Amino acid sequence: MTEKLSMQAIILKLQQYWSAQGCMLMQAYDTEKGAGTMSPYTFLRAIGPEPWNAAYVEPSRRPADGRYGENPNRLYQHHQFQVIMKPSPDNIQELYLNSLKELGIDPLEHDIRFVEDNWENPSMGCAGVGWEVWLDGMEITQFTYFQVVGGMEVDPVTSEVTYGLERLASYIQDVNSVFDLEWADGVKYGDIFKEPEYEHSKYSFEESNQDMLLRHFDEFEDEAKKQIANGLVHPAYDYVLKCSHTFNLLDARGAVSVTERAGYLSRIRNMARSIARAFVAERKKRGFPLVKDEKLRQQLLADEEAK
């Protein structure tokens, strides 16, 4: 590996590569979330029978992981490059390894290991069979075959590839701190994100208004339930994302006891499951329009009616 790609160049190369494999290039979803999986472009589109191939960068906020910009590898906000392919291609692992070649990483010259790490997101009712991908001893990617999303069985099989962009870039650029990464020519990662890391950490751990957050969680939950009842799936899901982020802020602040924590997660999970069912019902009502094979589409609609 000779070329030390900037983080911007890494993103562009991944976009070009996965676009060539048939993925639509989506944009980051504009509501706070803890992982790219929580974007509606993955969470909602992974369920139901319609095909879906997409790739996008997703800034992911995890308040409890903030370290005031002082830790070289732990961040309040990191960036994921998310790929979802449904149905999963038989050669998805080969496609992934070829994507590393596009970044100048020859799998034959490096120690690349798929380490079993089955994935679960209890708060969203999600689980799958998966692996961490380790490159010369550093985890750079999470690879998952979804089994359950929003409490619903995933069929057809859907694969998710999630690159940790900061880790991947740290390896490619051979730096020990994410803040030393080159984002673009002459601009360091720290020039953009170090101060926000400090400020968000200070807010999350010291300054957030707990009473306000507790009130907001209840209000967001009420609004989500109301819009589920109204059949407005996407606005309802936005409020579930808001509940999730609000809970993460409360958790980082130490405002939630162990017993209360389980209760909050259960409340989020129940809403996510309701939305998953409502989304599939909405797509069925529209006739599963992304299924282009008419015979298959009619069979899928008949199967849904028989359930």
Swiss-Prot record:
Report the locations given in the UniProt record. Cytoplasm
User: Cellular component terms, GO, for this chain's entry?
Assistant: cytosol
Reaction(s) catalysed by this chain, per the record, are: tRNA(Gly) + glycine + ATP = glycyl-tRNA(Gly) + AMP + diphosphate
- Where does this protein have coiled-coil stretches? none
Q: Where is the signal peptide?
A: none
Entry keyword set:
Aminoacyl-tRNA synthetase, ATP-binding, Cytoplasm, Ligase, Nucleotide-binding, Protein biosynthesis
Per UniProt, the enzyme's principal EC class comes to ligase
Q: What EC number(s) has UniProt assigned to this enzyme? A: 6.1.1.14
What's one GO MF term for it? catalytic activity, acting on a protein
**A biological process from GO:** glycyl-tRNA aminoacylation
- Please give the family membership noted in the entry: Belongs to the class-II aminoacyl-tRNA synthetase family.
Q: How does it assemble?
A: Tetramer of two alpha and two beta subunits.
What protein name is recorded for this chain? Answer: Glycine--tRNA ligase alpha subunit
Per the UniProt record, the source organism is Levilactobacillus brevis (strain ATCC 367 / BCRC 12310 / CIP 105137 / JCM 1170 / LMG 11437 / NCIMB 947 / NCTC 947) (Lactobacillus brevis)
